[in-house]
């Protein structure tokens, strides 16, 4: 994980596929093996891209030999006839017995209950609880940098809030936090950071404001995440009043990933269903297109906001011109000869007021679109990208060599079998091979356990991601609300001005 660099996610250079052919292996005991009877894992959907030696989504799952414990240490006794392939079909062979059907129904209910509980932990549409403002004074001797006032609006758990619940942070502090989260939670939806600068734009006020908004989105997405929001370093970032760079030099902190010293739950293995992997495959195959389409929608909403500003500016120019025309008509149409010009000028005054009022509406509509509508559209894009990055990091980090270890174990077991009955066989060599087998089995268990933990983690992320579907509704509801509000206001203005214009004279009669 320490090989990760940059702030824009993992490079999309790997040809490894998270959905490739797998022999997802987890040594388990007989009781767990029996409970998995009839459970089929997912068949490969994207074999063209598959080249991982081992993946967490698979067509089948190999098990540990009957003489291997589920702990990290294998038993001392070695049955040469036993190998890791023996349980491939045994633990996955389906039966049609009534008890098994009832058991599978129970697993399905357990899965639904698990999913419901996980989904309750996440609400991406909840109000932001962190506000970020740029501090006007810039620091630095040669290279000036911006500081940000980071304020949490509610009390955070197990922390002592600083004065006014506010701390001062730099962009580099946010970058450090993201890197730490990526190391600790490589398969969680870690949001992207805005760029530090683009060319010479690091002093441009428009760019700085966009970066501030991006930092605010980042930290608020982190705080809405059920797992990330409870991380001790996240809470430290938000509450330690001292300079974070100095704090990092004075203390030691752990960046090991969340799977360290953790074992997969037997309950999760029981509720696993192949349909889940098929859904993930479909998501991985279309996530890029969804991001592309939604980004284009967001761009069109943004362009509409820009057009509203252009319309407002043009109408202001039109209003000034109408005022000038009213002044000039008094000279062109002498009042003593054309008393109707007074009524016409009076009508143009009404038109001018109408333009001023509709101008206010256009400006306010543009502002509401910018502050209320666009952030919702862009927030959804950020979460989609975060999910995509989970898939990309999986390609980079979720590989293992379980299949190679299994072949190595089989080879050594055969060596032990061949050494039987040979008087010239070395006892020391025999013991060395036995020790190697134990070590390989231990590593195989650890890697298989990690593969299942990754599967559970990504299922949690994909499950909470399902709550983001309601963000689509929220986006268009806010968009329609703004459109409807100002369309009604402008319609009223047009009706009023039309009534006045109809009273303007069309002839001398």
Curated annotation (Swiss-Prot):
Residues 1-28 are annotated as: Disordered. Its main location: cytoplasm. InterPro entries: AH/BAR_dom_sf (IPR027267), PX_dom (IPR001683), PX_dom_sf (IPR036871), SNX8/Mvp1 (IPR028662), SNX8/Mvp1_PX (IPR035704), Snx8_BAR_dom (IPR045734). One of its GO terms (molecular function) is phosphatidylinositol-3-phosphate binding. It comes from the Eukaryota. It is a peripheral membrane protein. PROSITE patterns: PX (PS50195). One of its GO terms (biological process) is retrograde transport, endosome to Golgi. Residues 1-25 have a biased composition (Polar residues). Keywords: Cytoplasm, Membrane, Protein transport, Transport. One of its GO terms (cellular component) is nucleus. It is found in: Cytoplasm; Membrane. A 1,2-diacyl-sn-glycero-3-phospho-(1D-myo-inositol-3-phosphate) binds at residues 170, 172, 196, 211. Pfam families: PX, Snx8_BAR_dom. Residues 126-245 form the PX domain. Belongs to the sorting nexin family. This is Sorting nexin MVP1.
């Amino acid at each position: 994980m320490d090989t990760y660099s940059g702030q824009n996610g993992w490079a999309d250079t790997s040809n490894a596929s998270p959905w490739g052919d797998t022999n997802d292996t987890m040594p388990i005991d007989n009781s767990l093996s029996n409970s998995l009877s009839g459970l089929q894992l997912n068949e490969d959907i994207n074999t063209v891209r598959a080249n991982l030696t081992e993946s967490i989504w698979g067509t089948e799952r190999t098990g540990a030999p009957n003489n291997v414990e589920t702990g990290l240490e294998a038993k001392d006794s070695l049955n040469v006839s036993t190998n890791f392939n023996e349980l491939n079909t045994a633990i996955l062979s389906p039966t049609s017995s009534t008890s098994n059907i009832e058991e599978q129904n129970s697993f399905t209910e357990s899965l639904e209950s698990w999913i419901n509980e996980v989904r309750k932990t996440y609400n991406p549409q909840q109000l932001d609880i962190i506000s970020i403002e740029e501090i006007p004074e810039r620091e630095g001797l040669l290279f000036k940098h911006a500081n940000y006032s980071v304020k949490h609006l509610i009390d955070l758990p197990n922390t002592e809030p600083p004065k006014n619940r506010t701390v001062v942070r730099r962009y580099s502090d946010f970058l450090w936090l993201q890197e730490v989260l990526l190391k600790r939670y490589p398969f969680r939806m870690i949001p992207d950071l805005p760029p530090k600068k683009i060319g010479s734009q690091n002093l441009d006020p428009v760019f700085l404001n966009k970066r501030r908004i991006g930092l605010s989105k980042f930290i608020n997405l982190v705080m809405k995440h059920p797992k990330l929001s409870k991380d001790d370093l996240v809470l430290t970032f938000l509450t330690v009043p001292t300079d974070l760079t100095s704090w990092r030099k004075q203390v030691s902190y752990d960046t090991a990933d969340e799977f360290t010293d953790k074992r997969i739950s037997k309950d999760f293995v029981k509720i696993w269903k192949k349909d889940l992997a098929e859904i993930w495959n479909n998501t991985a195959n279309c996530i890029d297109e969804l991001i592309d389409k939604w980004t284009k929608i967001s761009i069109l909403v943004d362009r509409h906001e820009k057009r509203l500003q252009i319309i407002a500016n043009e109408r202001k120019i039109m209003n000034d011109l109408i005022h000038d025309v009213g002044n000039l008509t008094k000279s062109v149409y002498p009042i003593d000869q054309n008393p109707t010009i007074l009524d016409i000028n009076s009508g143009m005054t009404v038109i001018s007021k109408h333009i001023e009022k509709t101008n206010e509406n256009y400006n306010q509509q543009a502002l509401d679109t910018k502050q209320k509508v666009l952030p919702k559209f862009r927030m959804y894009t950020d979460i989609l990208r975060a999910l995509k990055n989970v898939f990309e990091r999986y390609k980079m980090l979720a590989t293992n060599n379980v299949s190679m270890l299994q072949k190595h174990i089989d080879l050594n077991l055969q060596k032990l079998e061949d050494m039987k009955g040979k008087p010239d066989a070395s006892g020391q060599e025999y013991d060395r091979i036995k020790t190697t087998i134990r070590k390989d089995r231990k590593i195989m268990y650890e890697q298989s356990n990690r593969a299942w933990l990754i599967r559970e983690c990504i299922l949690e992320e994909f499950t909470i991601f399902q709550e983001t579907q309601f963000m689509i509704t929220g986006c268009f509801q806010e968009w329609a609300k703004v459109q409807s509000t100002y369309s009604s206001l402008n319609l009223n203005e047009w009706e009023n001005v039309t009534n006045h214009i109809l009273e303007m004279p069309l002839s001398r009669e």
